[in-house]
A protein has these predicted regions:
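Cell-envelope and extracellular/periplasmic
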Residues: 1-167
């Protein structure tokens, strides 16, 4: 409380927050596996595991924010089906071992090339990619493109951090 203003936070957890990004193996939701995990889908209940899902969005320029497809939710039978199966079981094990809340930010997109999840600088560590970029992208634009991609990634990560902090 400060003067006449009061800020009250409810249902707030402090613990681990993991960004779960990648391709179809990370995107595969629990509700896509009813025959494999029927009991888990019916009985999953853990207020210390929460997740949110980021909307799939294409962008050719940096974005200051991300759109959320599914807001923060605690794991229970009505929500667990929307969570990435890989992320859910990882969080379940992590929460059990660390005994702290675990938040999952799911930002996966099946079929995306691995390069799209790698920084521009990171790709240059692989000569075949570096040569391809150098030969196929106009050299003058390469530096500008690299900067824009990095700015976009930085803005995306900042946005995820804010979502993790403020839900």
């Amino acid at each position: 409380q400060s003067g006449n203003e009061k800020l009250e936070l409810k249902n707030l957890l402090l613990g681990e927050v993991w960004v779960c990004s990648g391709q179809s193996n990370m995107e595969w939701r629990m509700d896509m596996l009813p025959a494999t995990y029927p009991d888990e889908l019916k009985t999953a209940r853990n207020d210390d595991i929460r997740f949110m899902v980021v909307e799939k969005t294409l962008a050719t320029a940096p974005k200051a924010d991300v759109t959320v497809q599914r807001k923060w939710a605690a794991v229970d039978p009505s929500t667990v089906g929307n969570c990435s199966a890989v992320a859910y079981f990882y969080a379940k094990q992590l929460q059990k071992e660390l005994k702290v809340p675990v938040g999952l930010i799911v930002t996966a997109w099946g079929g995306t090339p691995a390069q799209s999840w790698t920084s521009f600088e990171g790709l240059h560590e692989f000569p075949n990619y570096s040569k391809n970029f150098t030969e196929n992208i106009h050299p003058i634009k390469l530096e500008d493109m690299s900067r824009k991609i990095q700015e976009g990634r930085d803005a995306f990560v900042r946005s995820l951090k804010e979502k993790a902090e403020y839900g």
